[in-house]
Every structure is written in structure tokens, then in C-alpha cells.
Amino acid sequence: MSLFGVGFLAFAKGKRVCAIGRSSLGKISDPLEVPNLLDLQLDSFDWLIGGPRWRAALDAYRKNPSGAPIAEKSGLDEVFDEISPIEDSAGNMQLNFSKPVLEAEELSVRECRVRGRTYSAPLYVEAEFMNHDTGEIKTQTVFMGDFPLMTDKGTFVINGTERVVVSQLVRSPGVYFERTPEKNSEKDLFSGRIIPARGAWLEFEVDRHDQLGVRVDRKRRQPVIFFLRAIGMTDDEIRDAFGEFESISVQHEKNIGLSRDDALREIYRRVRPGEQASAEAGRALLENFYFTSRRFDLARVGRYKVNRKLGVDVDPTRMVLTRSDIIATIRYLAALHLGFSEVAVLNSNKSVPISTDDIDHLGNRRIRPVGELVQNQLRAGLARMERVVRERMTTQDIEAIIPQTLINVMPIVAALKEFYGTSQLSQFMDQNNPLAGLTHKRRLSALGPGGLSRERAGVEVRDVNPSHYGRMCPIETPEGPNIGLIGSLACYSRVNSFGFIETPYRRVVNGKVTDDIEYMTATQEDEHAIAQASTPLRPDNSFVDERVLVRRKGGEVEVVPADQVDYMDVSGRQMVSVATSLIPFLEHNDANRALMGSNMQRQAVPLLVTESPLVGTGMERYVAIDAGDVLIAEDPGIVGDVSADVVTVKQDDGKHRDYHVGKFVRSNQGNCYNQRVVVRSGDRVEKGTVLADGPCTDKGELSLGRNLLVAFMPWEGYNFEDAIIISQNLVKDDTLSSIHIEEHEVSTRDTKLGSEEITRDLPNVSMDYIKDLDERGIIRIGAEVGPGDILVGKVTPKGETELSAEERLLRAIFNEKSMEVRDTSLKVPHGQQGTVIDVKLFDAVDGEDKLGAGINQRVVVYIAHKRKITEGDKLAGRHGNKGVISKILPVEDMPFMADGTPVDIILNPLGVPARMNFGQVLETHLGWISKQGWKIEGDPDWAKDIRVREAQPDSRVSSPVFDGISEGEITGLFSSVFPNRDGERAVGSDGKAILYDGRTGEPFPEPISVGYMYVLKLHHLVDDKIHARSTGPYSMIIQQPLGGKAQFGGQRFGEMEVWALEAYGAAHALQELLTIKSDDVVGRVKVYDAIVKGYPIPTPGVPESFKVIVKEMQSLCINIEVVSDGEDDVSADAETLQIEEGLDTSPKVEVGSLEEV
């Protein structure tokens, strides 16, 4: 579901309908529609619960088995089959699970969000208990806990908040061989390891003496001949398998008399040193480590990788190791050590090529999507439950046992709760704008349980790998310590059933490009020559050039004859992610700036008025619809009634469908998510037509910012170092205004002294403060509130001494509550203000709401605040060009064009050359051209590739990534722009115009680049950052004010600032800052008293931090006494000094208190 509680799934294969006609200036026509951008999340979870998408994919695979095989069982079926049967130690009893079923959910997504509940469905499973002694079978359907469900937008609602489970990028199970240079010689050392999905590793290595050894479960190394004997190989079998490899033959001859039992004992001794070694113990050890499915699991993908790498033909459903796996691994390693290019497969007439593995290659890394992550957590919960079941089997009366009495579902519920609530991969959803949410769901993380840690990850694993092409974006990644560890899925990529990322290519047959699409993994792609999407083609789809530039394995580029090309890219945007594909002229930008542009688009706040970009890339409509924040028609029909909240459509099948419109909903980041209806009563709508725009969308297109008239010029130094000057018009017209909604919550609980109460009757509070509270004591909707205003009146009982009879009588007569209770009302925090737009009251006593233990009522108040653009706010373009507003100029002072049009924004031209993001200049030029409109007369050479010959003013155009309009074509279009009313073109063919100084009316001496750029307002708003403190909390130890806005702290006067005052000899100012303005506890109380009474400021005393350092030195047994000139002990207790000075009535700070003074 969407944020609004009612979501409408964008159909996966159909066209997205968009009201804006955007003209493409690209040369390539994409043969493949961009797939549904949420498929990664939706398909994976659907497999887990055995939903319709997975069943449809399985049916399609059975009819046409191509590509990676689809899993035959759902995730829930798999995990319950694995744990069945559970037997007691004697083998007399057995418990089996089958047929897991999810019932209907209790609450809708919208209700879960409002009530703070988890969107889930009860999970039931059929449990069968069998008594082997009597042959009796008891079957029951057992409740296994509430199972959190995914909404149709790929999110989970956990305790009322939307969360995303990020897919994890991990090393795939399988067999890997690597070469490491020997430190003290020029030799290379080779090793091979079998890595399971679950269980002990098995490692083989060749040492510097060319001896082949084995490590069991990463313990001490031992000769490989011991292991071969231990798994039951005879002398003849060893000679047949390894006779050609001297390193093994020599070992074999040395240990010719070694028996299997001796080998098992030796292995056990090395793996479990200090324990009694026996052949039986060694046999059990190896059996448990590598040959038992409960302890060792290669998983489907691991078996696939082992079979493919070693050429063995083991059953794909066999998840444990076989002798043939071990023999083939040792043969491969021995052949690799000898420098062979291929090795023959035993008992077969085929051979496999030999090479070492690049662990960072995407053929060796796989995705653990949400379904697998949840399945693993469920498996862990079931394993905990299994122990409880076995325990109960031995303690309960066997006659009275039924499945329900054996099963305790708490371990399963706890495991799922732990995963969704605290796992590193279950994250608070980024709802800053639709693109942020969509990107979050497509994110790939190498961190998390079973993954890397940012401290240990080196440069190699973070770096771009040639196999990322078309699978993982080489540009979009965080800038901080997570760089390279967190990535994003490329536009066209998909994840197969093994977890490997596939990307589509067009098949090339005899030098002719077909429209047959084939998805390939990174390993498959390495075997082919692939041409880029921009390679010129003739009308019959044959290559224009006889020799074509292609990619080969390892990213090598070469030119080959056209008939040797195997495949061709499907689109120019194939290699980049969704956010990066939204940057026009990406090909003209430095990659570092493109990275910043991709990340900053996710920080754009939804504006009051949305406007689609003049210059786009063609991806805007896909993002807007797939993100799920626009309302789209699910079936064709005629629009009936239309209101702000509901759109009714009479469908062609005669049914009426109501579409609920979300109004002023708070997102996770405090932004206003609001939907606006864009259809009218009587309109005809088709399936996929946009009914209502959401935040940051305009007629079904993503619209993160506004098109502003920009000039590249310096202006009085105000745009020095990326600072930005904007026009007062942008403030007055609310061009860059946004609404932000804050949520404030208060609960009443049962305390030892009685229950808290929500009331209007507050002790010692004047009527002015409660004038906007209703009779319940809750703020009315529409009230304007500021810092300190009461939102919800609440009183809490407080303990008292025993009252006399007279006092009790007076209390009863006059009903003085002030003595019994204290005011604990919910107030507007410091620095916040706005209008109350909604109030929600939840009651556990009278209502049906579940509020948790001890909570009687919960009130949630929503306050909205409109923020206009102001100095200190951060603006950015899509090319990594960012800056802070330094000056808002009156419109009459802004530079203006010859026709009197003032520019909206002035940027520093020095921000372009050093950053090498020239795309912003080309966007500015094309923005001007599309704003004015054009008509190409005749058939000039520069226009031969432009399909749009005429465009009206204010047209929307797209310049697709790596297929955009060229500089020569832009220059030509400048000469084809429609002239103004005077018959002149304000901007010349070089993209520059004469601007006039708004203050003097004089023209500037040089022509200036002018045009329309798409500008975003980022979430870094000055109102959230600016902070001031008068009085506030102090640190417990050193009694200095705390730091930071969150703690309502003070401004730090640090070491270097002290040096600055010392340099100027400002001794009194410095003394004041270091004592009475900071941590001279006695002195600051004296100053307060002096200011109140109008006395002169007294002399500062001793700071508390000085006393702390004295105490620290005394704790090191250094006897220190500090005495003043009058022989007084300076370190005397502060409270004593206060009493001596007679200041006992002044406010005090308790040591350790964070209360205000």
C-alpha cells in the first residue's frame, strides 16, 4: 500500500499512462519497456508466502524451461519441510509440519498506520503428532503467530511506521579458487575452498613446498591424503583420481600403509585437540560437518555453482557434499597449481576450463532479497522452537500430548519481531519524496548479518567491477564510510531465482540486431561480445559500420567485425540506476558530481506547487507511477463523482469503484504527502490513467523541483564559493515553499499514586494558555501554536505528606487540585510553530484500541508549518551543483533581460569548470529552447537526427542518458527558436544574452549565459539548524551547558576561540566566558541575583571543571590543595558557599540534573 493507506499496484508489464506529452530528443528507440521498479521486493516476498506472482512464474517456467529454474516450493513450505520431522531422543514420537496458510489480515494498512499497529496476518500450519509405539496420529491446525505482510508497494508497516527491508549483497555459496603471491619468494600460492550457505568450510591449499593440504572447519592444516583416506578412498581410487598430480602422489606413497581409522583419528585430533580421539568420533565429526543436511547446506545456488565450476553432474537437489565434489575440487586445485588451462572431469569425456575467481565479480556475489532474509529469520525461530518441542516431548504425559501442547510460538514471534524491529537490514523508510522511497526499496547493501563490516571492507570490494555493467549502478552510492558497500540496482536489471542479477540484451544474428531479448548473468555475459546501445544501425537493423566496438570479459573493449557481435545493449540507461537515469546530459558530467546529483535528488522536499522539468530524461513517468504515490485507475471507465477525498469511477464492467485520495499525510521525514485530483467528472480513463497526483508529481511525472530562469554571473561577491542569490519573487509567489508536519504524542498511564488524566483543569495555569483547548483538554484543530503552548493538558498524581483533618476538609470544600497533582502537559517544543491540522485520540478503556501495558489513553497531535525559502536554505540542481542561499534580492535589483524579464536565480560561473559538470550548462540552454519553443525550417545537416521538428512554447523534452542531444544540435536549435513579439531572439546561438543591472539599468559589459534550470529545494533547511539558548540543561560532572540543538545546548567557546581572545588581551571578557557564563555554579547564581535586583555583576569565582581536574589528580594519589590569597580553600563545596552568601532562595542545579535553571 502507499503512504496513504490505499495503494494501487502499477501493472508490471503494461504501459504507464502519462498526461504530459514529453518529446524525446534521443536517437535510440528502446525495444524493451522499463520493468516494474518494485519487482525485486514484490517477487521475493510473493515467493516466500507462495503468492500468485510466484505461481504464475513457476507455471511459465514449467511450460518453457529457460533461464534459472524457479523454486518448486514457496519459502514457507521450504522452511517447515526442513524442520520436519521433530523427534524425541528415543525416536518414539514425531511431530511434522505441513501446509502453512496465511489467513486474512485483521486490519488494513491505513488502520495499522493510524493505530500504530503491525500490518500482519495470522499464520496457521497443519501439525501432525505421531506416536510410534501405538501408531496413533493426532492432527491439528496450529496458530504460529502473526506474520508481517508486505504492502503492495514493497514496504512493511511495523508498529504504525513504514519500514523497508533492504536486499543484501553477499558472497554466493560455491567453490572458489584463488592465487596469492608468496611473501618471501616469487612463487604463487593457490587455494580452493568450498563455502556452504550454512555449515563448516572445507579448504584446500598448496604450500610453498608444493604440498597439498586441507583445513577442516578452518582449523589446523593437514595433508590432503589423510582426508581422502577418511572419506573412504582406497589406494587404487587415489591412484586413478590423482595419479597425474605429483604433489598428491608423493604424499600417497609416503602414507601407503595409512588406514581409514588412523586418518579419522588424526583428523579428529587436529580439529578437536585435547579430546579423546577415536575413529568413530572422527567419522561422526566429518559426517556432521559435510554430509548431514541438518548441519551442512550448500543451498540450490551453491549446488548450481559447484556443478558449473567443477563440471560434476550431481543431482541439483543434493545440498550436501559428495565424494565427487571433493575429488573434483582437489583435481582442479592441483591442475591450477601446475598451470593447466583445463582439467578433465573424472568418469566423463568432458573437461572444464581452469581459472582463479574474482570474489568481487557479480557472478560470485548474489542478492539475498527480502523473502530469503525473512525466511532465514523464521528458520532461526523454528530452530529455537524445536528445542522446546523436544523438551516437552520428554516431560509431558505421552497419552495427553496433542500438537498444540508441544508447540510454543513465542520463539518464532520474537525472531520476526527482532528482525523487523532491530535488524541492520530492516530500515526506517526514506519518505523524503517518491524517488527516495523507490531508491530505498532498490538498494543493495553489503553490510548486515553475514555480510561485510565497514571497518574491514577494503578498496577492492568497494570498487566498481566490470560485471556491475547493467546490474548495479557504478555511480549511485553514499559519499561517507559506506561508499561502495551500498549500491543501487540498475534500471533494467532483475534478480533470478538463484539470487544473481541479470540484465537484458538484444540478440544479434549474422550482424543483424533482433528484438529478441535475453537476460544474462555476469558469468554468462563473460562469454560474449556485446555492442553498446548507441551503435548506429540501418533501417533493417544491421550495423552501419563494418567493424563494431564491443565489450568482452573483464570489461576489455575491442573493435570486431560486425558478424562477430553476439549481443547488443537494450538502452543507454541500462548501466545506471533510477536516480542517475533522471540526470539529463549525464554523459557530460564528472562521475563524482553525478554521484552527488543522484543522492541529492533523494533529498528534495515536496513543494507546495509541483512542476515537471522542462528538460527530462524520459524516466520521470516510470518513477512516479511505480513509486506508488500517485493514484492510478485500475480498470477503464468513466469518472463519476469527484471530491477532494474520493474519486468514483464507473467501470466498463458496470461496477463502481471508489479511489480514496490521501490529504496532508505526514511522511516518515515530516514532509507533507498530499494528493491532488487531476480528473473531472465525465472524463474517460483507461487502465493506468493518473487520477490524482501525489507529492513531487505533476500529471503523472516525477517533479522534484521548479524550472527557474538562471544566469551564470558573479554579483557583488554574494555568490562566492557556491553561494546562491535568488529573487524576492520566489518567496512572494511561494515558488519554493513547502509544508512540513510534526507529530506530537502523549500517553496517560497508571502510576503507583493513581492514574494520570487528560484534562483542561490544570494547576497554576492561566486561561490564556488553555483558551484553545476543548472540554477534554485537547487542542482544537486550526489553532495557531508556538513554542511552549499547551497541546494536551495532562496532570499526574504526586506524593504528599499526611494531611490534618482541617486541611482535608478545606481541600474537600474548595476542591483544590493543585496540591494533589502536577502539570505534565504536552507542549510545543522550543523552535517549533504552526497550525494544528489533526488530532487523534486512542482509548484503551472505552475504545477497542490496544495501547500496551499500563497505557490508558494516547493523544497524537499533528502540526503543519509552511516554510518559505529563506537565506541559509540549500538548493541544488541535478548535476551535483549545490549551494546555500546567501541573499534574497528585491526583484527590482535582479539582473533583467532586454524584454524586462528578471532572472530568478544567479549562480557563480566558477562553479562549473573545476567541478566538470558541464551538463548543467547544456540543460540551461535546452531549458531555454524548450521554454520558447522551436520550428526547424528546411532540412539542415545538424537536424538530421532530430525527430521533433516543431515544439510549442513550454514544451517538455527528454534527453535520455547516453543518448542525448548534442552540442551542435543545441546550437542549431537556438537559431530555430520562436522569436518574441518584437521579432527578436533574446538569447543568441551561443546561449548568451545581454543582461541589464536592475539597480542602474545599465547593461552588463559581457553577454551572460541565461536559461532555465531545474532547481531542487533540499531537506537541509535553516529553520531546522538555527538554534539559540538562554537557559537550559547542564552537564552532570563539569556543570557546563550541554552541546547541540537536540539537547537545547549552548554555543561552545573552544580552545582556538580562547586563543583569539588571549591574543587581543581581552582578559575580562575571557574570564566571564570561562566562569559565570559556563561552569562557575556559585558565580552564575550570584549573577542571576544581581541582574534581578539591579546590582553590579559580582567578581567571578572558581569554575566547576577546575574542581573536577583537582579531584581527578587527587584520585591519582597526588595531594593537591588550592588556596587563595586569604588562605581560603577554593575547592569548598558550592552549596556551603551559597548558604554562607545567603543565596539559598535562588534557583539551584542539582548535580546530575538536566532540568532548566
UniProtKB/Swiss-Prot annotation:
Gene Ontology cellular component annotations, sorted alphabetically: DNA-directed RNA polymerase complex
Top-level class of the enzyme under EC nomenclature: transferase
Catalytic reaction(s) noted: RNA(n) + a ribonucleoside 5'-triphosphate = RNA(n+1) + diphosphate
A GO MF label: ribonucleoside binding
The protein's Enzyme Commission number: 2.7.7.6
InterPro entries named in the record: DNA-dir_RNA_pol_bsu_ext_1_sf, DNA-dir_RNA_pol_bsu_external_1, DNA-dir_RNA_pol_su2, DNA-dir_RNAP_su2_dom, DNA-dir_RNAP_su2_hyb_sf, RNA_pol_bsu_bac, RNA_pol_bsu_CS, RNA_pol_bsu_protrusion
UniProt entry keywords in alphabetical sequence: DNA-directed RNA polymerase, Nucleotidyltransferase, Transcription, Transferase
Source domain of life: Bacteria
Gene Ontology biological process terms, A to Z: DNA-templated transcription
Described purpose of this protein according to its UniProt entry: DNA-dependent RNA polymerase catalyzes the transcription of DNA into RNA using the four ribonucleoside triphosphates as substrates.
Subunit text: The RNAP catalytic core consists of 2 alpha, 1 beta, 1 beta' and 1 omega subunit. When a sigma factor is associated with the core the holoenzyme is formed, which can initiate transcription.
UniProt similarity note: Belongs to the RNA polymerase beta chain family.
NCBIfam families found in the cross-reference section: PRK00405.1 (NF001616), rpoB (TIGR02013)
PANTHER family: DNA-DIRECTED RNA POLYMERASE I SUBUNIT 2
The protein, known as: DNA-directed RNA polymerase subunit beta
Species this chain originates from: Tropheryma whipplei (Whipple's bacillus)
